[in-house]
Amino acid sequence: PALVERAGAMAVLDGGRLKPVSTYAGFHLLRTLGKRSFVVDTPEGKRKLSPVEWMLDCMFRPELAEQYPVFLVNREEVVRRLHLPDQKDKRKKYSYAQLAERWEEMTRAVREIRLLGETNLTEAQKEILSLARNFDVMRGWMLVSRIMLENPSAMERMEFPRWFPSAGRDGERLWTAAPDKAAGAFLAMASL
């Protein structure tokens, strides 16, 4: 759809670098699931979602996005440590909602792992840290539109990527890393 295409072409400032939303979302989906797309069941049948569609659903339809099985877990030790439901597949996929149910276990595990330091971590410990980081990114996306509506100044204190609209030639909207104080990511997304 045109909306997804336009959203994917917008620029986002992430970690001091300007990149297209499609690249930003694609990187996060690849890091979270190990793929650049995934299939979900809908009332109309199976549907393939792109990284941009996933990110937009997280931001504007979190009740759907939290059910998508996008968190890949490769190690049984991680499943056991976080008390996740077992699955037959070797490469297990969990939803945000399933991980949220185990948030306390995940937080406890992350705290214990961080006390050990960065060196000599097992692959399972590294996977838990990665899982928690990816969970936090998705949680941020799911909260971003609510935060911007309820308390826009909170965005200044948080490390969310930012989209900035600016006027282009003939009044056309362009996207840039040079912020206009009056507009933020929500307004940028809403103007699509």
Q: PLM features: what roles do these ranges have?
A:
Residues 1-192:
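Soluble extramembrane regions of membrane proteins in the secretory/endomembrane system
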